[in-house]
From Swiss-Prot:
Record flagged with keyword DNA damage: no
Protein known as: Neurexin-3a-beta
Organism: Danio rerio (Zebrafish)
Organism lineage string: Eukaryota, Metazoa, Chordata, Craniata, Vertebrata
Superkingdom classification of source: Eukaryota
Modifications made to the protein after synthesis: Processed by alpha-secretase leading to the formation of an extracellular soluble protein as well as a C-terminal membrane-embedded fragment (CTF). Proteolysis of these CTFs by gamma-secretase releases intracellular domains (ICDs) and extracellular peptides.
Residue ranges with Polar residues bias: 502-522
């Protein structure tokens, strides 16, 4: 009955939702038909000036003569990377002129009836060749995108004469970013710049089929077939771009050098600029040609001789200035180049005079802004500045010191560990009276409060126990051991927020904790085998979450950060039950090792017991009583005799009777 009750509402729901489903299906069909229409399928988002995406829709073809449009020309859809607003890989061609050439292998040279060319550019020149595609030597076919008198156009020759399609309405040498699209299908061609009007070219006269039909009527029958074949061959020669061999970009080989930037070149499926950036062996680059995003050798990232925590990374972000970025407790930022266009002019300004760009930044002018993305890696603590960042629970380490070691540590920049402040440590700075142990560890979160819920993923370590580097008795901590917020002097390292962003804690200890030590390196204890036992809670102890990193005011820095060997092997504390604050004891590690040993012994004993039980069972099975076996055999014999065939039993009885009869007859004869 339960399935029937569940099924009934489901059927009712389907009946209720059927109009919605029909409406949704109809809407999808109408939307797909609408988007596939010629006027709306060609919506393009052009990669306009830096940071601006221009959305536009291509207008309809003006129908001049229906006969000239026998085969539609698919020119309105530019490559996907340009439709989505991504400019693509960008190369800058300098004032001296440069050339980027691609050569097809001899056995891979294509011949095409339809060509598609799309490229983004910005320049201030009035004359220059952007791109030229040439056929093999001796054929003479070519296709050239060039600027003449500030107007951009395409000239191509596929066997007859030079055919030019030009955008004559507006000049493009305004230093702004433009996207030009050209498509050829046979002798038909179209050219469009940005969202401007489409420029078209169609051959004069009727179509090839009509001309062939007219010629066949006037040609004798015996010559009709050879003439038709000749015309078809001639027509193919006049519509096919034969044996394309090279693509040259820059125009310096034709004495018409291009100066500016080219982005996202697409030609018949080839992304030549992308291939050049990837180091394609068929591409050669000569002259003043540079990939946007390449950092010159003189301005490459370099690091000073300071410690890694305070290293200053210099990154050249523009060609007119270099930016110095100082990062504390961070690895050098990652530099990644992108294909996004970052400027629309050759200079950093919109000035069209290229000569004025040469004197900036010591001769590094005349270039574009580098598209540099600086990703800040995960902040690393000072304890392990060169190790992978692995989030661990917070850690507090108590280090035993003497007065001599305290004075040496203070001179080296390590904060004081005793209660006496600067009097015991020998520090002359009056502002350091309350300095305690500066602790750096892993963790995240706000000020420690067990009543507050965790605020991020790492705050699940809400409580933890402390582990000492030396063997200290639990009774040592019965005194007034407390952790308190630091009091920072004017020359000390300071966090921006003591309990929030910096999360730096100081701990002052009583003189009872100052004990002599004979080793400078703490013992290496396994991080995963500590502090699994419960301890009595100490109500006098207040613990704060320890910092992962803190910002250092470099104008007030008086000593290096704490990266001495005494902090290298900091054991990791494992959190215990929430809400209980605990103090470490010397018996923690001992009891942990004994429990581990007991566990191993128990496992071995259990295995031995199982083996003994198995051996005993096998022994009992092999030495069972033999009498039972004989009894079973006898019963089987009786059972088999009882189940035997009646005919066999009869034969046996007859043979027995005949034997007895013969014996009697023999006895008779003997007596007679």
């Amino acid at each position: 009955m339960r399935p029937s009750r569940v099924a009934a509402p489901f059927r009712g729901g389907r009946q209720g939702l059927s109009p919605w489903m029909w409406s949704l299906t109809l809407g999808c069909i109408v939307g797909s038909v609408w988007s596939s229409s010629p006027g709306l399928d060609n919506s393009v988002v052009a990669a306009g000036p830096p940071g601006v995406a221009t959305s536009y829709t291509h207008p309809e073809h003006p129908v001049h003569n229906p006969r000239h449009h026998a085969s539609p020309i698919s020119i309105y859809r530019s490559p996907a990377f340009l439709r989505s607003g991504h400019a693509g890989t960008t190369y800058i061609f300098g004032k001296g002129g440069g050339l980027l050439s691609f050569n097809w292998p001899a056995n891979e040279r294509p011949s095409t009836r339809t060509d598609r060319l799309t490229v983004g550019f910005s320049t201030s020149l009035k004359d220059g060749i952007l791109i030229r595609i040439d056929s093999a030597p001796g054929l003479g076919d070519y296709l050239m995108l060039h600027i003449e008198q500030g107007k951009i156009g395409v000239t191509f020759n596929i066997g007859t004469a030079d055919i030019t399609v030009q955008e004559s309405s507006t000049a493009v040498n305004d230093g702004k970013y433009h996207v030009v699209r050209f498509t050829r299908n046979g002798g038909n061609a179209t050219l469009q710049v940005d969202n401007w009007a489409i420029n078209e070219h169609f051959p004069s006269g009727n179509s090839d089929n009509e001309r062939i039909q007219m010629a066949n009527k006037k040609i004798p029958f015996k010559y009709a077939r050879p003439v038709e074949e000749w015309l078809q061959e001639k027509g193919r020669q006049l519509t096919i771009f034969n044996t394309q061999a090279t693509i040259t970009i820059g125009g310096s080989d034709r004495k018409r050098p291009f100066q500016g930037q080219l982005s996202g070149l697409y030609y018949n499926g080839l992304k030549v600029l992308n291939m050049a950036a990837q180091g394609n062996p068929n591409i050669k680059i000569n002259g003043s040609v540079r990939l946007v995003g390449e950092v010159p050798a003189a301005g490459s990232a370099r690091t000073t001789a300071l410690p890694p925590e305070m290293s200053t990374t210099f990154i050249e972000t523009t060609t007119t200035m270099s930016t110095t970025t100082t990062r504390k407790h961070r690895t050098p930022p990652t530099i990644q180049t992108t294909d996004d266009m970052v400027s629309s002019a050759e200079c950093s300004s919109d000035d069209e005079d290229f000569a004025e760009c040469e004197g900036h930044a010591g001769g590094l002018g005349g270039e574009l802004v580098f598209p540099v993305i600086v990703k800040d890696p995960l902040e690393l603590p000072s304890v392990a500045t060169r190790t992978p960042s692995i989030p661990f629970p917070p850690t507090l380490t108590i280090i035993e010191t003497t007065k001599e070691s305290l004075s040496m540590a203070t001179e080296a920049g390590v904060p004081c560990l005793s209660d006496g402040g600067s009097d015991d440590c020998g520090d002359d700075d009056d502002d350091d009276d309350d300095d305690g142990l500066m602790i750096s560890g892993y963790g995240s979160g706000e000020a420690y409060d067990s009543n507050l819920p965790p605020t991020d993923d790492e705050d699940f370590y809400t409580t933890f126990s402390l582990v000492t580097d030396k063997t200290l008795s639990s009774s040592t901590f019965e005194g007034g051991y407390k952790a308190h917020a630091p009091k920072w002097g004017s020359k000390d390292f300071r966090p921006n927020k003591v309990f929030d962003s910096g999360r730096t804690t100081t701990a002052s200890f009583s003189p009872k904790l100052s004990r002599s030590t004979t080793t400078s390196t703490p013992p290496k204890l396994p991080a995963g085998k500590m502090n699994h036992r419960e301890l009595k809670p100490q109500p006098d102890i207040v613990l704060l979450p320890l910092p992962t990193s803190y910002e250092v005011d470099n104008t007030k820095m008086k000593s290096p950060l704490i990266t001495s060997p005494m902090f290298r092997n900091v054991p990791t504390a494992i959190p215990t039950e929430p809400g209980i604050r605990r103090v470490p004891g010397a018996s923690e590690v001992v009891r942990e090792s004994s429990s581990t040993t007991g566990m191993v012994v128990g496992i071995v004993a259990a295995a031995a017991l199982c083996i003994l039980i198995l051996l005993y069972a096998m022994y009992k099975y092999r030495n069972r009583d033999e009498g039972s076996y004989q009894v079973d055999e006898t019963r089987n014999y009786i059972t088999n005799s009882a189940q035997s065939n009646g005919a066999v039993m009869k034969d046996k009885q007859q043979s027995t009777k005949s034997g007895n009869k013969k014996q009697k007859n023999k006895d008779k004869e003997y007596y007679v």
